[in-house]
Regions:
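Ubiquitin-like/PB1-type beta-grasp interaction modules and other compact soluble beta-rich domains
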Residues: 1-92
Length: 93
């Protein structure tokens, strides 16, 4: 995933992977997004929610991984090349 610069704003690419109900709501298993450098996981979730009301409902119940590590604080900044996994609650046993 490459970094690009537009004007004075530095933009970065991040990947988003959707699982289970999030995949169904998003209509895709993954996407790559170009975002402003310095956006947080919470900013990304807000943006995804604003684009798709069905996905917004699912995202309220999800947990997130950033490059395979649990996100405990949505104020965590994103960096070029990060991959965010969107994980709805799973049932199992």
């Amino acid at each position: 995933m490459a970094e690009v610069t537009a004007g004075t704003a530095r933009l970065i690419n991040v990947g988003v992977r959707y699982f289970a109900a999030a995949r169904s709501a998003a209509g895709s298993d993954s996407e790559e997004l170009t975002v402003r450098d310095g956006v947080t996981v919470g900013d990304l979730v807000d943006d995804l929610s604003s684009r798709n009301p069905e996905l917004a409902r699912v995202l309220l119940r999800c947990s997130y991984l950033c490059d395979g590590v649990a996100v405990h604080d949505k104020a965590q900044p994103l960096h070029a090349g990060n991959t965010i996994d969107v994980l709805p609650p799973f049932a199992g046993g």
